[in-house]
């Protein structure tokens, strides 16, 4: 059992910081709404968006993967652009790989705050 936990830890290059940051999202022209970030680091984030990631939408899991996503964090005055890399439709969660931000210094500060 110890081997499985070590393998999961090795997948991430950087340690994630547990947070609960409320944000607005936009995916393409059709989907927008609210969600919250569960954990973050400089390269990615785990987001919870049950309204976006749900099975009743008629969208298959493979359709989410690779989609561009814009995450706006009004409290921090920063927007994060990323790509969806994994989705869990049962939990309404997804993983986003960050491609760019509107303020890299501010994003780094958010990731480092305790």
List each model region and its residues.
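N-terminal helix initiation/capping motif
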Residues: 1-53, 111-114
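Short beta-strand-centered aromatic/proline hotspots
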Residues: 34-37, 80-85
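Short, conserved charged micro-motifs
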Residues: 54-59, 105-106
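C-terminal output/interaction extensions
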Residues: 8, 13, 91-114
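Short boundary/loop segments of OB/S1/cold-shock single-stranded nucleic-acid-binding domains
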Residues: 8-11, 58-60, 69-70
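Residue-level recognition of conserved beta-strand positions in structured domain cores
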Residues: 49, 73, 82-84, 97-100
């Amino acid at each position: 059992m110890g081997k499985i936990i070590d393998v999961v830890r090795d997948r991430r290059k950087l340690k994630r910081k547990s947070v609960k940051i409320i944000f607005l999202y936009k995916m393409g022209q059709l989907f927008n709404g609210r969600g919250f970030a569960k954990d973050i680091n400089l390269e990615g984030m785990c987001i919870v968006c049950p309204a976006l990631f749900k099975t009743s939408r008629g969208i298959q899991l493979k359709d989410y993967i690779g989609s561009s996503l814009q995450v706006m964090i009004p409290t921090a005055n920063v927007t994060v652009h990323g790509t969806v890399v994994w989705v869990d439709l049962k939990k309404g969660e997804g993983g986003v790989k960050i491609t760019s931000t509107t303020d890299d210094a501010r994003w780094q500060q958010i990731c480092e705050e305790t």
